[in-house]
């Protein structure tokens, strides 16, 4: 199932996004009653996808990000691979959905895109063994860990650099069953203004999905809807006013966001 969050003529709701991926004109949004956790029930209302607006598919209580999880990205940033996952938090106020502008702060330059596979937690969990991680995952989506590099380098810690409003685009929906694809080996591609900037596979992660969930859940309780961004491969680079960033992950879809400088409409 593809679970989205939509603004329809009747308000905001979760919905099952039905139809062939890549054929938006033939896709529909089927409204889910209440929330998508457990076994969703449906209201009976539906709309053509073109008649609704896709929002961020989930409003997480927290966004946990994994840094330094691809060797090639570590190399391009001049670091060394960590023995254990390196994690940090983004505020949930950074979350935006598809086609919503990434707003560049006036006092930040350069600002980089970072295309990532994102895990969506399906139920409250703590101290989850790696082998049981899948039992606690609702599904997968796409994230962009937008980062103000000058602030990241000057501050020594990453909260300001990665916590600005709009610095966590997520979407376009949550895929609960990736079969026949394997989340441990998905193609990831980031395109800026039509130029391919990142091209990798999730199999190149240093710490895999099970290890990530085990590590984070040993530290903090994960709640339904929490997001885990699993790290970015090499190829990150600057985005500027007027750019368009599209991140595509095999089996999930494409997350696209325009870029504007703060203060512009």
Curated annotation (Swiss-Prot):
A single GO molecular function, which one? acetylpyruvate hydrolase activity
Query: Which family does this protein fall into?
Result: In the C-terminal section; belongs to the FAH family.
Q: Could you confirm whether the keyword Transmembrane appears in this record?
A: no
Question: Organism source for this protein?
Answer: Mycobacterium tuberculosis (strain ATCC 25618 / H37Rv)
> Where on this chain does a divalent metal cation bind?
114, 116, 145
Alphabetically ordered keywords of this record:
Metal-binding
Family annotation (PANTHER family): ACYLPYRUVASE (PTHR11820), ACYLPYRUVASE FAHD1, MITOCHONDRIAL (PTHR11820:SF7)
The protein, known as? Protein Rv2993c
Q: Which Pfam families match?
A: FAA_hydrolase, Rv2993c-like_N
Q: Which InterPro entries match?
A: Fumarylacetoacetase-like_C, Fumarylacetoacetase_C_sf, Rv2993c-like_N
Q: Which cofactor does it need?
A: a divalent metal cation
